[in-house]
Design a protein with these regions (language model features):
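Short, low-complexity N-terminal intrinsically disordered segments enriched in polar/charged residues
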Residues: 1-30
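A beta-strand edge to alpha-helix "cap/lid" segment located at domain peripheries
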Residues: 3-4, 35, 48-114
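Structured beta->alpha junctions
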Residues: 13, 39, 67-69
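A short gly/proline-enriched turn/hairpin at secondary-structure junctions
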Residues: 31-42, 57
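Short beta-edge strand/loop motif at the mouth of beta-sheet-based domains
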Residues: 41-49
């Protein structure tokens, strides 16, 4: 039985909070799309690289996902990630298919604080 979008995102959020890159990437379809202001990343290898960069910018961050609006197979998300040296705030949209994330858009700002 495929997981619901809510279950997939719960797993995804747990992996992000733990900084577990393997678990983060495992939530995506093999041919998933990650759409950012810098362009489109296709597939798990590119998604791994994108998340590795983000997690390196804000290591050991405290993550919060205060706004989560699910509608069918879509999630609108607002998030923050805070460390002793930086704060990131972002807005994402996810599209789920089957048991994974099929498409994600992301836009965030990163502010150095320390």
């Amino acid at each position: 039985v495929p997981r619901t979008p809510q279950e997939i995102f719960e797993t995804h959020g747990t992996a992000i909070r733990a900084g577990d890159l393997d678990a983060v990437v495992a939530d995506y379809a093999e041919d998933a799309l990650l759409v950012t202001p810098a362009g489109v990343v296709r597939g798990r290898p590119g998604i791994r690289e994108a998340f590795a960069g983000l997690l390196a910018e804000i290591p050991d961050a405290t993550w919060d996902f205060p706004t989560q609006h699910f509608a069918d197979d879509v999630l609108f998300l607002e998030w923050t990630a805070v460390t002793g040296r930086a704060r990131a705030e972002g807005v994402d949209t996810f599209v789920f298919a089957g048991d994974s994330i099929r498409v994600q858009t992301v836009r965030f700002t990163l502010e150095r604080t320390g």
